[in-house]
């Protein structure tokens, strides 16, 4: 649980939110650099990104590294609850779930788990056989969502470039990845930004290393030159993910 925030201004970097205390919740490291995000952080990230009641209906949202669906399940739940506030048309709700909620995951087992979780959730409302727009594929190679998303949310994979094997060259082809010993999560910022439409919002939880590292230079310059950072929630030295030693920031880009 997020207990207290203090707010400070930091010039063109937007608002800096410093958290003093968060609940201690165990989560697991996921292979391919992903970690499972606890519910309380998912809710904070979605709220920070303004994916909230009254701002959800017929808005495109994607988690481009969805894992087993931790974010997507919350997104579907919010979409369903928001829809029922103005309509009881189950057929139309099914159509909208298929149209406006998107996901990508490279691990087939994980994407299948995500689908199963979402199916179980909506079946409670009498909705069956949803043709989810969830793709089992490599996000680095997918551009069909570019310039279309109202919301991009998630917890990108943390993988150092020297551990990327076959994806090394793909990562280095990205502006944000073409500098120093980069990390895959940095490239996911570039991918996420490209997915946004003109009024879209990106809300990620990631390590804070890009603020000071050589590998984060291109990303920092791009964000500052284009005045993209709306807010940052800095978890400081609190270890939100107990099995890691990263310092974490929640970043909102608009």
Predicted features by range, described:
Residues 97, 135, 246:
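Residues that flank catalytic or metal-binding motifs in active/ligand-binding sites
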Residues 100, 131-133, 228-231:
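Conserved beta-strand segments of alpha/beta enzyme cores
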Residues 115-142:
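S-adenosyl-L-methionine
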């Amino acid at each position: 649980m997020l207990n207290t925030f203090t707010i400070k201004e930091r010039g063109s970097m937007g608002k800096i939110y410093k958290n003093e205390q968060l609940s201690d919740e165990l989560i697991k490291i996921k292979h391919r650099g992903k970690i499972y995000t606890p519910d309380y952080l998912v809710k904070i990230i979605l709220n920070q990104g303004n994916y909230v009641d009254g701002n959800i209906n017929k808005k495109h949202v994607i988690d481009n590294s969805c894992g087993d669906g931790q974010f997507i399940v919350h997104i579907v739940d919010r979409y369903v609850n928001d829809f029922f506030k103005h309509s009881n048309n189950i057929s139309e709700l099914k159509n909208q779930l298929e149209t406006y909620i998107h996901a990508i995951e490279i691990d087939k087992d994980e994407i299948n788990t995500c689908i199963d979780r979402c199916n179980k959730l909506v079946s409670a409302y009498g909705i069956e056989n949803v043709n989810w727009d969830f793709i089992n594929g490599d996000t680095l190679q997918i551009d069909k969502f570019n310039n279309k998303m109202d919301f991009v949310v998630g917890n990108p994979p943390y993988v150092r470039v020297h551990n990327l094997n076959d994806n090394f060259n793909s990562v280095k082809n990205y502006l944000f990845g073409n500098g120093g010993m980069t990390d895959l999560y940095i490239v996911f910022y570039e991918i996420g930004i490209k997915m946004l439409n003109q009024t879209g919002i990106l809300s990620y939880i990631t390590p804070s290393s890009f603020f000071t590292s050589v590998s984060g230079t291109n990303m920092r310059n791009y964000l500052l030159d284009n005045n993209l950072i709306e807010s940052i929630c800095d978890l400081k030295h609190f270890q939100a993910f107990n099995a890691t030693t990263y310092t974490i920031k929640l970043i909102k880009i608009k």
